[in-house]
Curated annotation (Swiss-Prot):
Official protein name in the record: 4-alpha-glucanotransferase
Superkingdom in the source lineage: Bacteria
GO annotation (BP), single: carbohydrate metabolic process
GO cellular component terms, semicolon-separated: cytoplasm
Family: Belongs to the disproportionating enzyme family.
Main location: cytoplasm
A GO molecular-function descriptor: 4-alpha-glucanotransferase activity
Keywords: Carbohydrate metabolism, Cytoplasm, Glycosyltransferase, Transferase
Location relative to the cell: Cytoplasm
EC number: 2.4.1.25
Reaction equations catalysed: Transfers a segment of a (1->4)-alpha-D-glucan to a new position in an acceptor, which may be glucose or a (1->4)-alpha-D-glucan
Lineage: Bacteria, Bacillati, Cyanobacteriota, Cyanophyceae, Synechococcales
Length: 505
């Protein structure tokens, strides 16, 4: 899949600049693409784009197929006639330099409802037709998602398994009653998806026009409280009485955690999925490839075997390994989408030879993270001289790591010296540029750097601290932080290590 050496930047759209408290798909997105192009980058990596709930984690979404409506640019809606421009002039001040989820969601929700009212009363024929075509094109999932969100709001946010049994288990009469009762609310959520997809497709088209590929995340598991599970309960291991997860996903105890990690997502009923030819998974991939060029599968090892923890357990200690039909699944996916699947395998953690064999059979690139390269001896697989071939994506760090500056500062003097000994020296521009150079010089076909590392920022700017529920997903950059020196220096390194791709247009 990765047939040319190249590089790119990791930045979730919520981290883009905007004047409404959260990054969006407005001018900031287009300006960031221009920065990528000016720096001779070829890839923009993002986190999952789905609608987030409690905790604002993009890895815990109400749908694996929908787009987060809080990413919708209000300025662009005003430009397109969905809002009177004067309305946005009355916006409250957003003074928090980080994402202010509470204030941003409260304000944007109010304004988006006004856009919906404008859409319903002053609809243009062309927009009406475009909306109808969108709803038809996304009919596999959109109606279920919109009804799920409308019913959830009518239940004050309660999870679907807490609803009355008739609607929780989708009895036809209950679906009709709720659909009729919440017809306007369902239309509203369809409208938000129409706007979100419309704006994202314009962003993606501009990125592709500037020779930037969009590289996104696809978590293997979906949230229990999601339209995906509610609309397709047969695909998941659920308690038939309560609707709760009968078998929960996680990972077993290891050196880092004596009790393992219990994620709580329901694991898949792979026998049912296999009997349908993996139809739900194929639909999911097709939907994601509408707005992504490359897909990173989070927790890839779960396609070879997965750790299942019985209902009622409080930790992951008492789970078991269960086989998963990874080979059959990827064969079916290749048959549906073509053999050269644009997939990167997140193969971090405890990876067995069987997982590596599955990855290699389908020629999926794996991941290398330089922050993990200096924690053991010279056989460490993350050290660049141990990369067996170029079919890999190398990172300075990921969204789950500290920034490179923060990572280096937190190391002991002895550990810092190990890093310096390997590098030879720390370049004048700082440790972050030294690791960017190290990643760029490796044989890995694709090198990815979080924007925080390009900017040389510290621990206060990390995106996520795994295992913590608060304070994550909030970092944003200021537009003044991107400048000609940065793009020029990154372009120089990209050219120096053979990662610049030349284009004729």
């Amino acid at each position: 899949m990765l047939d040319k050496r190249c590089s790119g930047i990791l930045l979730h759209p919520t981290s883009l600049p905007s004047r409404f408290g959260i990054g969006d798909l407005g001018d900031g997105a287009f300006q960031f693409i221009d920065f990528l192009a000016d720096a001779d980058q070829s890839v923009w990596q993002i986190l999952p784009l789905g609608p987030t709930g409690f905790g604002n984690s993009p890895y815990l979404c109400y749908s694996a197929l929908a787009i987060n409506p809080w990413l919708i640019s209000l300025d662009r809606l005003a430009e397109e006639g969905f809002l009177p421009p004067s309305l946005l002039d009355q916006a409250p001040p957003f003074t928090n330099p980080r994402v202010d989820y509470d204030q941003a969601i409260a304000y944007k929700s109010q304004v988006l409802k006004q856009a919906f009212a404008q859409f319903r009363t002053n609809i243009e024929l062309a927009i009406e037709q475009e909306f109808a075509e969108f709803c038809q094109a996304q009919s596999d999932w959109l109606a279920d998602y919109a009804l799920f969100m409308a019913i959830k709001e009518a239940h004050n946010g309660a999870g679907w398994h807490q609803w009355d049994k008739d609607i929780a288990w989708r009895e036809p009469e209950a679906l009709k009653i709720w659909g009729d009762r919440l017809k306007t609310e369902v239309l509203y959520h369809q409208f938000l998806q129409f706007l979100g997809f419309r704006q994202w497709q314009e962003v993606k088209a501009y990125a592709n026009q500037r020779h930037i590929a969009i590289f996104g995340d696809l978590p293997i598991y979906v949230a229990h409280d999601s339209a995906d599970v509610w609309a397709n309960p047969e695909n998941f291991c659920l308690d038939p009485e309560t609707g709760e997860a009968a078998m929960m996903a996680g990972v077993p105890p290891d050196y880092f955690s004596a009790t393992g990690q219990l994620w709580g997502n329901p694991v898949y009923d792979w026998e049912t999925l296999k009997a349908t030819g993996f139809a739900w998974w194929i639909k999911r991939f097709k939907a994601n490839l509408q707005y992504l060029d490359i897909v990173r599968i989070d927790h890839f090892r779960g396609f070879e075997s997965y750790w299942g923890v019985p209902q009622g357990e409080k930790t992951a200690e008492n789970g078991e390994w269960y086989p998963a039909p990874g080979k059959e699944f990827f064969q079916a996916l290749g048959k549906a989408l073509g053999d050269n699947l644009p997939i990167v395998a997140e193969d971090l953690g405890v990876i067995t030879p069987e997982v590596e064999a599955l990855r290699d059979e389908f020629n999926f690139p794996g991941m290398k993270v330089l922050h993990f390269a200096f924690d053991s001896d010279r056989g460490n697989p993350f050290l660049p001289f141990n990369y067996s071939n170029g079919n890999a994506v190398v990172y300075t760090g990921t969204h789950d790591n500290d920034t490179t500056v923060g990572w280096f500062q937190e190391r002991s003097e002895d550990d810092q010296q190990k890093v310096i000994n390997y590098l030879g020296c720390v370049c004048n521009e700082g440790i972050h540029w030294s690791l960017i150079r190290l990643a760029s010089s490796s044989v890995a076909a694709l090198a990815i750097f979080p924007l925080q590392d390009i900017l040389g920022l510290g621990s206060d700017c990390r995106m996520n601290l795994p295992g913590t529920a608060a304070g994550n997903w909030g970092w944003r950059y200021h537009p003044d932080q991107l400048n000609d020196w940065l793009s020029g220096h990154l372009s120089f390194i990209t050219e120096l290590y053979g990662r610049r791709i030349y284009h004729t247009d």
